[in-house]
Design a protein with these regions (language model features):
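Active-site metal-binding core of divalent-cation-utilizing nuclease and nuclease-like domains
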Residues: 2-26, 39-85
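A short, terminal or domain-edge coil/loop segment
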Residues: 3, 100-112, 165-177
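Structural alpha-beta junctions
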Residues: 37-44, 79, 108-115, 133-140
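Conserved catalytic cores of phosphodiester-cleaving nucleases, focusing on short active-site segments
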Residues: 70-102, 114
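Short, charged, amphipathic alpha-helix that recurs within catalytic cores of restriction-modification
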Residues: 95-133
Length: 177
């Protein structure tokens, strides 16, 4: 890293640490949305990203008509057709209760990919919880803050054609469960 590179994000490096879990959650949601869901792109010009933290900007209705508010929502316009949704958790949000009350309804939304972002070190616990509740997660991601900003790691990949051809024991090892 050169000195020029090191100082380009000095404002980011000097941001004060969050003072509460809520402040950390809000900051993480905003940073993850910018890092991973920055739509529209040239390839997906109709996609738009909405962040529902700290205030709800685009609620999502489930099949029963109940409103849910995922942290991050990506829709295809016109028509606001739901494509992706993401839930960002802090360490205290990786629990059975949270999974039952929040993750299960999000994973049941039709025709949408559900991504779950948990802090580094909580990926295994999140996968075990999701397996116990039969939650279909399209992608597990871990996040943490480093001096340069947020770092996001993919800890699973969506099932593909090759996955179906693998023996069950190999699929289980790849999922980390």
């Amino acid at each position: 890293m050169t000195i020029d590179t090191r100082w380009t994000d000095v404002d980011k490096m000097l941001q004060p640490a969050p003072k509460s879990r809520q402040e950390l959650h809000e900051r993480a949601v905003q940073d993850i949305a910018l890092a991973r869901f920055e739509f529209p792109t040239p390839e997906l010009a109709g996609y738009r990203t909405f962040v529902n933290v700290p205030e709800v900007t685009l609620p999502v209705k489930d099949e029963d008509g109940n409103e849910t508010n995922p942290d991050i929502v990506v829709v295809d316009t016109p028509g606001n057709i739901l494509k992706l949704l993401a839930q960002v958790e802090t360490a205290d949000g990786v629990t059975d209760e949270r999974a039952r009350d929040v993750w299960v309804p999000f994973s049941r939304l039709p025709d949408a990919a559900f991504y779950l972002f948990v802090p580094v070190g909580y990926g295994g616990a999140a996968k075990r919880i999701c397996k116990s509740f039969d939650i279909d997660v399209y992608g597990y991601r871990t996040w943490r803050y480093v001096p340069e900003g947020i770092e996001i790691n993919d800890i699973s990949e969506p099932p593909g054609i090759m996955t179906a051809l693998m023996p069950p024991i190999v699929r289980k090892m790849l999922r980390g469960v």
